[in-house]
Amino acid sequence: MSFQTVFQRYELKYLLTQEQKKKILQAIAPYMELDQYGRTTIRNLYFDTGNYRLARHSIEKPSYKEKLRMRSYSQADPESPVFVELKKKYRNVVYKRRIALPEKEAMEWLQGGSCSQDVQIFREVDYFLSYYRNLAPVVFLSYEREAFFSEERIYKTSFSKYGTAYQSMIYPGLVQPVYAKATEPGTVREAVCYG
């Protein structure tokens, strides 16, 4: 399976009504087409420190921020491939590096184990893990996405719809979402945006 491991792009994000989405789809129709996967369910498990250092920093809207997540495009089991992604944003430019691993191996690595791979992206994630120390999964976020690309695949427009579908969780029975105050370290939370 071939996949892109390094990304650099500008991201502009907007909240849209259904009517606005419809108008944008009409406007881009001559120039862009739905990607090969159509509508996709994306599941992210974000890692942070016990005091939510990464999330708190991100909320401050700094010129530089970073995050670590595990992403799946299907319901994952221990042998399913997932992506470990290190995402950094500097002055509106997003840099993303990712690697594919079986879910069980990825989770063990991200929670303090070691990884047998020796490529640059693994070393970058290892550095991130050692720098922030004791990272744990804290937020699960699932949403539906439709992505459209220009013919040259230079431009991408995507629409994401967030919801509360518990059945689409990446870890059934392991990480159950609970609503908790951000001051409760180690509590997994589900972030839900309605739109």
What are these regions (language model features)?
Residues 1-195:
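Phosphate-end processing signature that detects enzymes handling 5′-triphosphorylated RNA
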